[in-house]
Swiss-Prot record:
The keyword Cell cycle does not apply. This is Putative 3-methyladenine DNA glycosylase. One of its GO terms (molecular function) is DNA binding. Pfam families: Pur_DNA_glyco (PF02245). HAMAP family: 3MGH. It comes from Nitrosococcus oceani (strain ATCC 19707 / BCRC 17464 / JCM 30415 / NCIMB 11848 / C-107). Belongs to the DNA glycosylase MPG family. The lineage of its organism: Bacteria, Pseudomonadati, Pseudomonadota, Gammaproteobacteria, Chromatiales. InterPro entries: Formyl_transferase-like_C_sf, MPG, MPG_sf. Keywords: DNA damage, DNA repair, Hydrolase. SUPFAM superfamilies: FMT C-terminal domain-like (SSF50486). Its EC number is 3.2.2.-. GO terms for biological process: base-excision repair.
Length: 201
């Protein structure tokens, strides 16, 4: 039995997957990161979603299948890691916003040019840099051993929630939706002042 998260784990609504990814581990060679903060980009109603205007060469990995990598460049320098969710043909994903280092700290710091906490891994571009990712990782299956993997972690009972970051272009109902989730009482979380205990319906 493996602790790799299987494809069916990702084949659900992005918000469900986002909540269940908190506490899971991102692993690449000797680097292991615990996921502490995520953002859900849902389908089809989310106007912050990269697929809102249809499929393009840049966002093509976003359309599936689930459980694969969607990476894109932000400001031409930061590689932002997204995990594709939902059914194939739906442009949905979870952005990994922040992580806690578990193993490989020396290599992480070299890749991050000597940065130390708390700014080492609190931001999506920082996560991509710590893992040494580039656009060649697009489409990579996260559920297969080797390369970049996502492994089960200890479930997180209570979550923080708040609006996503940097989506001023979205409709107000999506811009303000509490689709950014994080682990409470963890220093490896960004923009903490905008987060509140998540209310379960």
């Amino acid at each position: 039995m493996t602790d790799l998260l299987p494809p069916r784990f990702y084949a659900r609504d992005a918000l469900e997957v986002a909540a269940d990814l908190l506490g899971a581990s991102l692993c690449r060679e000797q680097v292991v990161l615990r996921i502490t903060e995520v953002e859900a980009y849902r389908w089809p109603e989310d106007t912050a979603n990269h697929g809102r205007h249809g499929q393009t060469l840049r966002n093509e990995p976003l359309w599936g299948p689930p459980g694969r990598v969607y990476l894109y460049l932000c400001y031409g320098i930061h590689h932002l890691l997204n995990l594709v969710t939902g059914e194939e043909g739906q442009a949905a994903a979870v952005l990994i916003r922040a992580c806690e280092p578990v193993a490989g700290l020396d290599l992480i710091q070299r890749r991050r040019r000597g940065k130390i906490k708390p700014g080492l891994l609190t931001g999506p571009g920082k996560v991509g840099a710590a893992l040494g990712l580039d656009l060649s990782w697009n489409h990579h299956p996260l559920y297969e051993p080797g390369g970049l993997e996502v492994r089960r972690g200890t479930p997180v009972a209570a979550l923080l929630a708040g609006p996503r970051v940097g989506i001023a272009y979205a409709h107000p109902e999506h811009r303000d939706a509490p689709w950014r989730l994080a682990i409470p009482d963890n220093p490896w979380v960004s923009c903490r002042s905008q987060l509140q205990p998540r209310q379960q319906n």
